């Protein structure tokens, strides 16, 4: 599969490809990571890559309606155990704040089989509709 084929599918379509064995979760993740690495220098969207943890998860047994589908999580109230959690705040970033546990939303995403491979930029505490 290449990225042009990947982008033709929504999340359920990608999950169906994984379930049928046409593509693996690891292959989808590799495509998603490659695309983010290509566009992120221009967008500054990905601020906390979690590629290694995502590769481990994608290589395991995944279940749920979105099993094997790569996803990015906003760095805003979606805590992931052991990952930076700054909510766009420079003070929290300088202090090196890390989440102690997964939020309920992250637990549900993971139970649905999603493979979170990074955290994305956010305006400070979500107060604006744009990031700088």
Predicted regions span which residues?
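An N-terminal boundary/leader segment
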Residues: 1-48
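Flexible N-terminal pre-Rossmann segment of NAD(P)-dependent oxidoreductases
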Residues: 3-7, 63-69
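Short glycine-/small-residue-rich flexible loop motifs, especially phosphate/cofactor-binding loops
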Residues: 15, 61, 106-107
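Short secondary-structure boundary/hinge segments and terminal tails
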Residues: 35-36, 54, 125-128
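Long amphipathic alpha-helix in the N-terminal Rossmann-like dinucleotide-binding domain
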Residues: 52-59, 110-114
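Glycine-rich loop at the start of a catalytic domain that most often binds anionic cofactors/ligands
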Residues: 58-62, 78
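Short glycine/serine-rich loop/turn segments
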Residues: 67-132
């Amino acid at each position: 599969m290449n990225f042009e084929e990947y982008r033709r599918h929504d999340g359920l379509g990608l999950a169906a490809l994984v379930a049928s064995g046409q593509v693996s979760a690891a292959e989808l993740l590799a495509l998603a990571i490659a695309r983010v690495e290509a566009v992120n220098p221009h967008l500054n969207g990905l601020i906390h890559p979690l590629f290694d943890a995502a590769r481990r998860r994608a290589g395991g047994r995944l279940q749920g309606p979105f099993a094997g589908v790569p996803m990015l999580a906003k760095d805003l109230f979606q805590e992931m155990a052991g990952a930076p959690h700054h909510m766009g705040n420079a003070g929290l970033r300088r202090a090196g704040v890390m989440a102690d546990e997964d939020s309920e939303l992250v637990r549900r995403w993971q139970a649905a089989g999603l493979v979170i491979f990074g955290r994305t930029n956010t305006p400070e505490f979500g107060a604006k509709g744009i990031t700088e």
